[in-house]
Amino acid sequence: PNILPGDQYVVFEIKGWKCGILICYDNNIIENVRATALLGADIIFMPHVTMCTPSPRPGAGLINPVLWENRANDPTSLRQEFDGLKGRAWLMKWLPARAYDNAVYVVFSNPIGRDYNEIKNGCSMILDPFGDIVAECRKLGDDFVIATAIPEKLRQAGGYRYRNARRPELYADIIGQPHESNQKVAWLTETTNSK
């Protein structure tokens, strides 16, 4: 695929809201979300093609395609796989924290169904600056949700206070140290992984 890691942060405006976008793996590096929030993003769009993939993480792995093909007859078995550690349970370990810690709205999208030789579990959702899910796609098929973003939540959320309480003089030299990125993700080639 012609997919490469991003090399800059982007904040743009939509109808008065400052928005950022971090694609898939970029969201796994917590500093990316913080940097985008510090650039003024109120909403961060997070398009993904993730979950239900091979991984050394306990409980991770592929979904048996038979479960997807049989979803009309046995939705419960598929839902258990989709919501377990291969999918939603893993997502809930980190995604709400990105919204909460940075006091931003998060618009997370992920496909459902066949993606080449893998089955994806969807779980597209919108989270508020408190890290609470305000809308989520739960159908075992195509779905979409909408939500109303409330500007006041941006400053009411704990993450807003914590961002303002930061003391970069304590850790700027630590966080800013030179570091060679080693991104070990399946879809990157060896050439790209070593950049």
What are these regions, as identified by a protein language model?
Residues 2-3, 89:
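Short gly/ser/thr-rich secondary-structure transition/capping motifs
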Residues 4, 8-39, 46-48, 154-195:
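Cysteine/selenocysteine-centered motifs that mediate thiol-based redox chemistry or coordinate metal-sulfur cofactors
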Residues 18, 27-144:
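CN hydrolase (nitrilase-like) catalytic-core segments centered on the catalytic cysteine
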